């Protein structure tokens, strides 16, 4: 247990109550009252990484003919496309003398180590040692199963080293490779916290109002198997923003996690004169237990009102709007405490059920329990929060406010 800034944090197990500032009594409860105080419990973030498909980014960013380093799952990987057109992911350190393959060169179908030119194929086997008579039979390194789909590169992570089953395949995104939609407008950032923080947002309706300036009118969750879905409708906030441009009336969103780290959000923005149909990707992969790479991208459906150039401009504008939202989240994550025992009200949603669903990806397949994967459905009654928030919005308008409360 540690004490930080007036907050006791139980790291693991149980502990006696200790205070470095025992001499201070302002705002502090007595020892006899300590049993009535709610303490934050927080175990160390798991060092095991989630089983499932993880998106490393857009394929186009790996397609320049060079090897690329990716720090993921507590290690360093190298990504390269061989001369045969296959994209490969290997452990980045050569099994010969530890050279970094990401600093090497693609030669034919192999990646050549910059140290002694050992050539490694996409199957993990050393294909050639140019200066040697023979290639050692034990010259084999770790490989990662890959998937190229809808312009994105995925890798499969499994601590048990099993191959992915068809049931967990990432679904194809209608429009991602269609001329009727724009190309991906994509963002990447590093977040220095455990990736469970972003998962909690699936059930957190209230933060959309307080952090993102939305006004939710409908909110529902369904968890089943390896999927967790958030259904949300929101109204516009007339107390926010300027008067230039078309006024946004609200949004309709169906956002599903397909496994532990890849969310597809069918998101429609409703404006006064038209609707903009988009697909938003929200995905991440862990660097280590306490940091992850957050990526998000958007495509926009073209229409008579949104021809090619204007549609791409809209994708960029909406993408920048989404970027602002994620930056608001990151600012919270950067400063908040990890908490395993959140104190909740009904309107906070099924946080514990969501975390139980999420736990399935951190245990062996044989240890997955029915309550991790059985269908769970919860619809929030938005009557009370909507009334409270609408009252705030009206007060902001009356006061001439123009910022998020």
Locate each region found by the language model:
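A general structural signal for short secondary-structure junctions and capping/turn motifs
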Residues: 45-46, 69, 145-147, 284-286, ...
């Amino acid at each position: 247990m540690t004490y930080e800034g007036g907050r006791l944090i139980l790291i693991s197990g149980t502990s006696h109550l200790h205070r470095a500032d025992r001499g201070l009594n302002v705002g502090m409860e007595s020892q006899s009252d300590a049993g009535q105080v709610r303490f934050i419990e927080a175990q160390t973030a798991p060092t095991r990484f989630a089983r499932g498909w993880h998106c490393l980014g857009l394929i186009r960013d790996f397609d320049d003919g060079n090897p690329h380093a990716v720090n993921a799952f507590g290690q360093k990987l190298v990504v390269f496309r061989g001369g045969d057109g296959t994209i490969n992911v290997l452990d980045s350190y050569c099994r010969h003398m530890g050279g970094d393959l990401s600093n090497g060169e693609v030669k034919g179908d192999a990646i050549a180590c910059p140290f002694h030119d050992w050539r490694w194929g996409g199957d993990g086997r050393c294909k050639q040692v140019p200066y040697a008579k023979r290639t050692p039979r034990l010259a084999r390194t770790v490989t990662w199963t890959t998937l190229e789909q809808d312009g994105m590169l995925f890798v499969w992570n499994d601590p048990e080293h099993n191959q992915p089953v068809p049931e967990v395949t990432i679904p194809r995104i209608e429009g991602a490779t269609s001329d009727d939609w724009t190309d991906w407008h994509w963002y990447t950032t590093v977040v220095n916290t455990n990736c469970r923080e972003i998962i909690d947002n699936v059930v957190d309706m209230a933060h959309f109002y307080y952090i993102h300036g939305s006004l939710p009118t409908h909110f529902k969750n369904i968890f089943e198997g390896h999927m967790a879905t958030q259904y949300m409708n929101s109204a516009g906030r007339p107390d926010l923003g300027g008067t230039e441009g078309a006024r946004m009336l609200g949004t309709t969103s169906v956002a599903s996690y397909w496994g532990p780290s890849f969310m597809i959000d069918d998101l429609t923005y409703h404006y006064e004169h038209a609707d903009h149909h988009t697909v938003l990707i929200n995905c991440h992969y862990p660097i280590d237990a306490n940091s992850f790479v957050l990526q998000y991208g958007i495509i926009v459906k073209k229409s008579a009102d949104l021809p090619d150039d204007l549609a791409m401009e809209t994708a960029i504008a909406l993408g920048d709007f989404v970027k602002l939202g994620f930056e608001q989240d990151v600012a919270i994550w950067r400063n908040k405490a990890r908490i395993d025992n959140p104190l909740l009200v009904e309107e906070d949603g099924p946080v514990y059920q969501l975390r139980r669903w999420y736990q399935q990806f951190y245990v062996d397949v044989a240890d997955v329990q029915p309550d991790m994967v059985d269908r769970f459905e919860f619809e929030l009654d938005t009557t009370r929060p909507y009334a409270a928030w609408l009252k705030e919005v009206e007060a902001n308008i009356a006061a001439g406010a123009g910022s998020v409360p």
